[in-house]
Amino acid sequence: MAERSTGLPSQRQVVELLDGEFTRAGYDLEDVVIDAASRPPRITVVTDSDHGLDLDSVAELSRIASELLDGLDSAPYVLEVTSPGVDRPLTTEKHYRRARGRLAEITLTDGSVLTGRIGGVADGTVGVVVREGRSNLSVREIALNAIAKAVVQVEFSPPSPRELELAGVSRKEARA
């Protein structure tokens, strides 16, 4: 069945157009969502980096994307450049690396669920700081392929200095 033309570029076209420029700017192109049904149509570009995504970065990446996409002969659309958001599941080693020091709910492939602070990532494993009882903390090394799902949790109070230390995060990094 032939795909109906929306007058918008395809996801693949947008990725091919933007990926190299975003990489040169130090960012990973995580996803592109084309929503032709919304009015006006929307192109959402999801990007991230090891040093995060601040408003200045969003503005610069939006400018780059807009200039490149304007070169295409397409229907009008709204362009949105955004970060993946806190509810994005952690699926790759780089996602875990970027979430170091953050609290996550982790579902293992055996069905068990644990909540812990993401620590270091190396050789296909992630260190997770888990609380055992009220005050005991330990680091559990978990193979990434043993994790079915992991999602960063929103926190309303700061972690203990010991928890951050076990996760390999300095207080300065935790505040950033």
UniProtKB/Swiss-Prot annotation:
Disulfide bonds: none annotated. The keyword Phosphoprotein does not apply. Its main location: cytoplasm. GO terms for biological process: ribosomal small subunit assembly; translation. It is found in: Cytoplasm. It holds the Pfam family DUF150_C. GO terms for cellular component: cytosol. Keywords: Cytoplasm, Ribosome biogenesis. Required for maturation of 30S ribosomal subunits. NCBIfam families: PRK00092.2-2. Belongs to the RimP family. This is Ribosome maturation factor RimP. It comes from Mycolicibacterium vanbaalenii (strain DSM 7251 / JCM 13017 / BCRC 16820 / KCTC 9966 / NRRL B-24157 / PYR-1).
